[in-house]
């Protein structure tokens, strides 16, 4: 049974304390026992290897007990590590699932955005076509196609007259607005001066009255 590396530290701490209690050199035998447990696949192979190591300094009556104790502790450490590993795997799987769902949402939103963009472009294109058709129709109405006749020339003249009148009206309205603005400004200045003059007169009357007293 090969062991994960993460359980080696926990088991090694326990093993070192147990070897110290047996007055066995932990520096020599600790790493040796740990290596055997990690390399041997079956429980029987592990037990035989442990007995071969520990028989050098343990009596026969305690050898079996110590071997069983070491194997039991090793198995428990492996089980706890497996549970932690499974929990970690479950957490990793949950995070991966969440990331996948978020990625799907982003893709779906992007697809919706693309669809909305396409619909918008289609509407704009349709509107542009309609506008172009209307503009062409207006141009056809304003500028008759074909050989100019007296009637078409008369229509063109009328259109120009209307446009000129509108331009004159706009210019006149602009000029009137500017004049009104200047008049209002002048009136405000007059009102301001009149108000100041009244204040000055009132002030002078007050000063005269005080001097008479």
Curated annotation (Swiss-Prot):
PANTHER family: COILED-COIL DOMAIN-CONTAINING PROTEIN 43 (PTHR31684:SF2)
Family: Belongs to the CCDC43 family.
Biased composition (Acidic residues): 131-142
Protein name (database record): Coiled-coil domain-containing protein 43
Annotated source species: Danio rerio
InterPro entries to which the protein is assigned, alphabetical: CCDC43 (IPR037666)
Ranges of compositional bias, category Basic residues: 201-213
Lineage: Eukaryota, Metazoa, Chordata, Craniata, Vertebrata
Keywords of this entry: Coiled coil
Residue ranges, compositional bias (Basic and acidic residues): 169-200
Region entry Disordered, spans: 127-213
Entry keyword rRNA processing: no
Amino-acid biosynthesis is among the record's keywords: no
Coiled-coil region(s): 119-206
Extent of the signal sequence: none
């Amino acid at each position: 049974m090969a062991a994960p590396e993460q359980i080696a530290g926990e088991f090694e701490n326990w093993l070192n304390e147990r070897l110290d209690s047996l007055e066995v050199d932990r520096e020599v035998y600790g790493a040796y026992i740990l290596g055997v447990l990690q390399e041997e696949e079956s429980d029987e192979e592990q037990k035989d290897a442990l007995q071969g190591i520990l028989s050098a300094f343990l009596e026969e009556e305690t050898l079996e007990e110590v071997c069983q104790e070491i194997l039991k502790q090793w198995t428990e450490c492996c089980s706890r590590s497996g549970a932690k590993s499974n929990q970690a795997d479950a957490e990793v799987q949950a995070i991966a699932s969440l990331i996948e769902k978020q990625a799907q949402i982003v893709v779906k939103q992007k697809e919706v955005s693309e669809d909305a963009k396409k619909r918008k472009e289609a509407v704009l294109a349709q509107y542009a076509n309609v506008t172009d058709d209307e503009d062409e129709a207006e141009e056809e109405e304003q500028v008759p196609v074909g050989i100019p006749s007296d009637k078409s020339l008369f229509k063109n003249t009328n259109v120009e007259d209307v446009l000129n009148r509108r331009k004159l009206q706009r210019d006149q309205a602009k000029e009137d607005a500017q004049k009104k603005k200047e008049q209002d400004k002048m009136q405000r200045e007059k009102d301001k001066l009149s108000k100041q003059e009244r204040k000055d007169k009132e002030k002078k009357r007050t000063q005269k009255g005080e001097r008479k007293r």
